[in-house]
Amino acid sequence: EKLEREGTTADSYEKLGAPIGEGTYGTVWRATCPRTGRQVAMKKVVLRSEREGFPVTAVREVRALRRLSHPNIVELLDVCAAAPASGSSSPGDAYLIFEYAPSDLTGLLAYRKQKLKPPEIKCLIKQLANALDYCHLKNIMHRDLKPSNVLITAKGELKLCDFGLSRLFSGPGNYSTRVITLWYRPPELLLGARHYDHRVDVWSAGCIFGELLAGHPLFPESSEVRVFQKICERCGATSQETWPQELKSLPQWDKFAPRGADGENPGTDIYRDLLLKHGEVAVDLLRGTLQLDPELRIDTQGVLQHRFFAQEPLACQPSEIKINDPRLSCHELDVKRHREKLREDREALRQQQSQKRSAAPGAAQAGGQPGADEGASPKRPRVG
């Protein structure tokens, strides 16, 4: 049995501060085990009734992590339950207890004062490729790879987490298309493919790699159609002639098919932009991970053996990655809270200025009314 029984019940763990994450089936807190003093992450699994039972996403996560043991994959330490509320007929909530990491990749990128340097990017991508390679060797697809599911420890070690959408595979099978967060979803899933394999994870890893190189998400759109259009534009695939026949036969092709002419300049080609900043070798690896045809897409072994990692400057050591203060929580939820606070502060300042203009002499004669120039609140930027 892999699990360490650090506590007998969830009540033996002491939660510290506000939640640090919100998952598919519960909320995540930083906590300590009073018996060992170890900091851990507690993910609550809400059990609404005995009939519903343990959520399938939680079952998948436990099953996957019991099969996996790797330095770059988060460790599941315990599964325990909290006592039900007094007088309640509902079962108590269950908790998954994980090793704690003070940051995820979203938080690292948001709070750093400078972009990642090439040796840091190489170090992170190599660790990510190692984690994925091990998963695929164990016949597990992650199917939800994104920056917020990539944890960073205080020592700069990368830990792949959140296996709630993972599943076993033994080659292309009849799987769900409603997996992988939209910005990191490969074109075959956007087009409705149900027979796919581990290379869907490689596309997502390529999106993360490109995000580290560019300093921003590659395909940030709000719908499947718009993400597909963004892929067409940014990958130089605005003509139907550039798409493989296998993808043209998928259910959503007629709805999503690009309308550009063959040879048309997309104008926002990511490879052209990144070639100037990072060179041909980095762009070659990115192209390999973002191949539109999954049959031609590089696999994790191909990533690890790519000349990108042998080219100077070499990858730094994890401990050399400049991370945020490990005493602080720097996760996606913290980034969202920070952006929401900034939005509220801007809105309060705008209303204050509007009221001052309205109260100024001559405002009434000019037709000004308190709040007359108020518009809709700015939309909060979405984090991958």
Outline where the language-model segments fall.
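Activation segment signature within eukaryotic-like protein kinase domains
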Residues: 124-125
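Protein kinase glycine-rich loop
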Residues: 16-24, 28
